[in-house]
């Protein structure tokens, strides 16, 4: 739209066009709308409802009480708005993507069907199923009545449990506000904790308000000494597990009553039903067309990097790229929401707003009225979402939850981690928005990729081969204030980012992976990425136990004692110029749980030995000496482990899925099957960690310690067995006498490292081809000789040469020619490019050149002091040549200034630093002295190190730091020796395994043999 067609009604009121509601709005309007190029904002207050300009027309953003805002009206004009609902109960087929727990009180009786009213007097749980109708893809909300929240208690003899529960409720201020219906009944259950528990009487305590569960359970435990079970299971999980439902999939409802008035949601259709009306269609794994949104924001930073609580730091633009999961990747609808006028952008719908407030209302309503289910972006959990929500709440007093998919009781928040210190594991910012599946592709990329950095540009280049056009945040104010053309350029950049993120979503197909994990773990999709793996295993264990009438106790303090974790076979550091075979235990920890039948329900703890009566040691149970004494676990024929049973069924299902995958030709179905098997793999690997997290949902550190103990024992047994094998033993493993050529009779196997679930075996005297020949047979022979199913060793990879530095740190060349690095940074990421490239040349030479490899092997097998007395092997001299050439390049000024630059972020104002004795701050102060443009907060300040004035030795880094542009412009010589020392330190860290695994020794050798010319 051209600038002349847009007018700002809040700067030039045209009151005749506006309907005045009772509400008054605050608007912050950029001054550049009145005076091009001006900074700052104008504060305007008035009753005008939010407005938008689109295609030369002025429209009202906000909708009426039915949620019919600008996006809904647009759909109505296109003929894609809300379909008609039946006026009577009829069957309904629909797909569910989210399940919510809400509470109705008796006040709702007037608006719900009469046969449902008994469920909500005085209050009751109503489960909301959000999804799409099968018939036409319309968004639906199904309100399900009849689900209960409950827990179990084992009470002392003589306690009147019902009276105790009522007493607890009377003591609660919550219950006085909302009366709660109570039911207490005796049931027969068994505790899962410990072998030999017999079925007994427990009290099942049902409460009509879920918030009462925790209070009542704590009261019974603390006041009356009751043992509490499953008080940490919410009504949503009860709904899924009690009825064998799914969290993502197709449902059928035999009698769905449409709700035409007094609706709870903004879905296109809303229905009421009871739990008993529902059934699941598991055989159908297809998806309806769900709506995915990728968004990005551009902000104005008046004083540097934008701060949400600074009124003038407006959100200038929001790009929204929409994609339907039923469409091909790339078929996107591109939308730009912008403040002020903006020239047209090809392929983009541009909506112009007079103020930020109007644009925020439009953004929230876009998510609601376009029925968005999946929201993604890049680092949106840490920046975009907090920024939008902070602006909405703190600047404009908007409640974003009220604009969501649920009319009341919705959540729209960002939960930031409060502590990143000791014991804080995998702390992530969590986005919780009712009715949305939030997926931050930044977190996904960090989890699935191994890159030097995870900027969107880097990831897009690596995965998509796409180049991201970047605009520095310091350019944003200038572009925005420049007028419609500047905003067009800014908008193109903004939309491009969102489109790239949507491409990444489709590349990883992460939405399908999330859905498959949700199904197998019995949890809603929105909890998959943010809530970790504990909740997944807990839900599965709960489901398995429930089928056998077992119940899970609440964890106690005694369950949280520490234990010794996994250990490794210490590495024999050095350079190995012979093949190194790596054998892995396939799914080590899950296979140990299966092989030894480990579980809460098969364990007999110290002091409970009477439970072993009638059982035979070794035949009926195994014993393990742990930190707290001797623990026993009964074998499968006595009682099958729930954990092992889960693993067995999952792995069998995964095997069946992989078989289907191999025969499947439909691309979409192949994607679903692949994500299903991956979801099973992830969940299997989480079982051990579930038992070993002291502050987890159901910890049992005795099980975790038993697993790690067995893992250590298995590594040690395998090491001894492998090292005892002779070439003749290996020859005998050939599938037939003539299948293999004779192996080298002088060959020898030696385990040089063992890491949790793998062994590194040096195959000294064997060729690469010989090692590859016997690798699989060796692994299979070791498995047959030492272990029971399903424990299995597999030949994973073979290195042709290997630099083994310390545990979990090595670099080597695989037999296919690829270089593999584990735990190794060639140099620190903060090192300059000069040091990085030269260190890479050194490493490549050591791993690729035959003479250098021989020399490196010799060096690693002798004391480093011999290098001073006997000199370096001739084959190692090319490494020294690289370092000497680097020094010459520095001295003669052949290294570009850009390769010598370092950079550090200016994280706060200069006055806020406790010490300014840092190189980047020294350069900042030089900018001040020279009256040059100053960097803003969050800018990275570049610097190089130059020779100190007068050639003073031992000068501090702050005295040597200089602006690269200034140094190049004025011919200031760089600090040659400083950079060369950095290079030697980087090379020494790489080569330390050649010199007694001592980086200091390696540095002294390199310093001794590099020919640093005299001054």
UniProtKB/Swiss-Prot annotation:
Its EC number is 2.7.7.7. It is an enzyme of class 2 (transferase). One of its GO terms (molecular function) is DNA-directed DNA polymerase activity. Coiled coil: none annotated. GO terms for cellular component: host cell nucleus. Gene3D superfamilies: DNA polymerase family B, C-terminal domain, DNA Polymerase, chain B, domain 1, Helix hairpin bin, Palm domain of DNA polymerase, Ribonuclease H-like superfamily/Ribonuclease H. It comes from the Viruses. Disulfide bonds: none annotated. It is found in: Host nucleus. GO terms for biological process: base-excision repair, gap-filling; DNA replication proofreading; nucleotide-excision repair, DNA gap filling; viral DNA genome replication. It catalyses: DNA(n) + a 2'-deoxyribonucleoside 5'-triphosphate = DNA(n+1) + diphosphate. Keywords: DNA replication, DNA-binding, DNA-directed DNA polymerase, Host nucleus, Nucleotidyltransferase, Transferase, Viral DNA replication. Forms a complex with the major DNA-binding protein BALF2, the DNA polymerase processivity factor BMRF1, and the alkaline exonuclease BGLF5. Interacts with the putative helicase-primase complex composed of BBLF4, BSLF1 and BBLF2/3 proteins; these interactions may coordinate leading and lagging strand DNA synthesis at the replication fork. PANTHER family: DNA POLYMERASE CATALYTIC SUBUNIT (PTHR10322), DNA POLYMERASE DELTA CATALYTIC SUBUNIT (PTHR10322:SF23). Belongs to the DNA polymerase type-B family. Replicates viral genomic DNA in the late phase of lytic infection, producing long concatemeric DNA. The replication complex is composed of six viral proteins: the DNA polymerase, processivity factor, primase, primase-associated factor, helicase, and ssDNA-binding protein. This is DNA polymerase catalytic subunit. It comes from Epstein-Barr virus (strain GD1). The lineage of its organism: Viruses, Duplodnaviria, Heunggongvirae, Peploviricota, Herviviricetes.
């Amino acid at each position: 739209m051209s600038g002349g067609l847009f007018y700002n009604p809040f700067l030039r009121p045209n009151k005749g066009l506006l309907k005045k509601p009772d509400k008054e709005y605050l608007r912050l309007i950029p001054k550049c709308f009145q005076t091009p190029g001006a900074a700052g904002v104008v504060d305007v207050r008035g009753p005008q409802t939010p407005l938008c300009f689109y295609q030369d027309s002025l429209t009202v953003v906000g909708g009426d009480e039915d949620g019919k805002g600008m996006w809904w009206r647009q759909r109505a004009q296109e003929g894609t708005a809300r379909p008609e609902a039946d006026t009577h109960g009829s069957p309904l087929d629909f797909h569910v993507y989210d399940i919510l727990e809400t509470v109705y009180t008796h006040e709702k009786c007037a608006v719900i069907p009469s046969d449902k009213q008994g469920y909500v007097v005085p209050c009751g749980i109503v489960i909301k199923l959000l999804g799409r109708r099968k018939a036409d893809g319309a968004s639906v909300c199904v309100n399900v009545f009849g689900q209960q929240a409950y827990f179990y208690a084992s009470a002392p003899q003589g306690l009147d449990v019902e009276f105790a529960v009522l007493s607890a409720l009377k003591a609660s201020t919550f219950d006085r506000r909302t009366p709660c219906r109570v039911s207490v009944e005796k049931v027969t259950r068994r505790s899962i904790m410990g072998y030999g528990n017999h079925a007994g009487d427990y009290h099942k305590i049902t409460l009509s308000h879920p918030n009462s569960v925790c209070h009542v359970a704590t009261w019974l435990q603390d006041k009356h000494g009751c043992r509490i079970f499953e008080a940490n299971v919410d009504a949503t999980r009860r709904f899924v597990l009690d009825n064998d439902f799914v969290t993502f999939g197709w449902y059928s409802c035999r009698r769905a009553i449409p709700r035409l008035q007094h609706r709870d949601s903004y879905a296109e259709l809303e229905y009421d039903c009871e739990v008993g009306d529902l059934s699941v269609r598991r055989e159908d794994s297809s998806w309806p067309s769900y709506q995915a949104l990728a968004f990005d924001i551009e902000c104005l930073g008046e004083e540097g990097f934008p701060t949400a609580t600074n009124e003038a730091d407006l959100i200038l633009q929001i790009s929204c790229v929409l994609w339907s999961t039923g469409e091909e990747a790339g078929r996107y609808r591109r939308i730009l929401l912008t403040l002020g006028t903006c020239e047209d952008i090809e392929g983009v719908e541009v909506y112009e707003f007079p103020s930020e407030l109007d644009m925020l209302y439009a953004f929230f309503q876009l998510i609601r009225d376009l029925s968005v289910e999946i929201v993604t972006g890049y680092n949106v959990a840490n920046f975009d979402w907090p920024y939008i929500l902070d602006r909405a709440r703190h600047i404009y007093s908007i409640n974003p939850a009220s604009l969501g998919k649920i009319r009341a009781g919705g959540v729209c928040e960002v939960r930031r981690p409060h502590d990143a210190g000791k014991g804080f594991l995998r702390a992530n910012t969590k986005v919780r928005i009712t009715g949305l599946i939030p997926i931050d592709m930044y977190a996904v990329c960090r989890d699935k990729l191994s890159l030097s950095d995870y900027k969107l540009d880097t990831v897009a280049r690596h995965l998509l081969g796409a180049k991201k056009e970047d605009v520095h945040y310091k350019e944003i104010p200038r572009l925005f204030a420049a007028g419609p053309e500047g905003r067009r350029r800014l908008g193109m950049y903004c939309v491009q980012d969102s489109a790239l993120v949507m491409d990444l979503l489709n590349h990883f197909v992460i939405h399908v992976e999330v859905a498959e994990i949700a199904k197998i773990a019995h949890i809603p999709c929105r909890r998959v990425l943010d809530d970790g793996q504990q909740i997944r295993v807990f839900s599965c264990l709960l489901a398995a136990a429930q089928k056998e009438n077992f119940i899970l106790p609440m964890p106690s303090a005694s369950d949280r004692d520490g234990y010794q974790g996994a250990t490794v076979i210490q590495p024999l550091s050095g350079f190995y110029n012979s093949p190194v075979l790596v054998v892995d235990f396939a799914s080590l920890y899950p296979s140990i749980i299966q092989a030894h039948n480990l579980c809460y329900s098969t364990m007999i703890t110290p002091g409970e030995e009477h439970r072993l009566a009638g059982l035979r040691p070794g035949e009926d149970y195994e014993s393990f000496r742990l930190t707290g004494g001797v623990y026993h676990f009964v074998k499968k024929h006595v009682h099958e482990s729930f954990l092992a049973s889960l693993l067995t069924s999952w792995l069998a299902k995964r095997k069946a899925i992989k078989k289907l995958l191999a025969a499947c030709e439909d691309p979409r179905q192949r994607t679903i099957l692949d994500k299903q098997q991956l979801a099973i793999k992830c969940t299997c690997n989480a079982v051990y960690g579930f038992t070993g997290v002291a502050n987890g949902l159901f910890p049992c550190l005795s099980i975790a310690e038993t697993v790690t103990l067995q893992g250590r024992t298995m590594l040690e047994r395998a090491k001894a067995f492998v090292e005892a094998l002779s070439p003749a033993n290996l020859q005998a493993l050939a599938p037939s006498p003539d299948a293999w050529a004779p192996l080298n009779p002088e060959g020898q196997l030696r385990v040089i490292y063992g890491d949790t679930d793998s062994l590194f075996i040096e195959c000294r005297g064997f060729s690469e081809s010989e090692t590859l020949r016997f690798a699989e047979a060796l692994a299979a022979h070791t498995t047959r000789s030492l272990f029971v199913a399903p424990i299995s060793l597999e030949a994973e990879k073979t290195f042709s040469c290997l630099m083994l530095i310390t545990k979990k740190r090595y670099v080597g060349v695989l037999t296919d020619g690829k270089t593999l690095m584990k735990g190794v940074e060639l140099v620190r990421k903060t090192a300059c490019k000069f040091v990085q490239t030269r260190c890479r040349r050194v490493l490549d030479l050591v791993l690729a050149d035959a003479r250098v490899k021989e020399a490196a092997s010799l060096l690693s097998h002798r004391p480093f002091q011999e290098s001073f007395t006997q000199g370096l092997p001739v084959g190692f001299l090319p490494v020294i040549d690289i370092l000497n050439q680097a020094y010459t390049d520095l001295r003669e000024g052949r290294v570009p200034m850009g390769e010598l630059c370092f950079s550090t972020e200016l994280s706060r104002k200069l006055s806020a630093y406790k010490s300014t004795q840092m190189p980047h701050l020294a350069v900042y102060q030089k900018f001040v002295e020279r009256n040059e443009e100053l960097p803003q907060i969050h800018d990275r300040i570049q610097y190089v190190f130059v020779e100190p004035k007068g050639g003073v030795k031992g000068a501090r880094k702050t005295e040597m730091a200089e602006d690269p542009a200034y140094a190049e412009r004025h011919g200031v010589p760089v600090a040659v020796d400083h950079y060369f020392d950095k290079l030697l330190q980087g090379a020494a860290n790489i080569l330390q395994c050649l010199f007694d695994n001592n980086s200091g020794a390696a540095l002294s050798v390199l310093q001794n043999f590099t020919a640093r010319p005299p001054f």
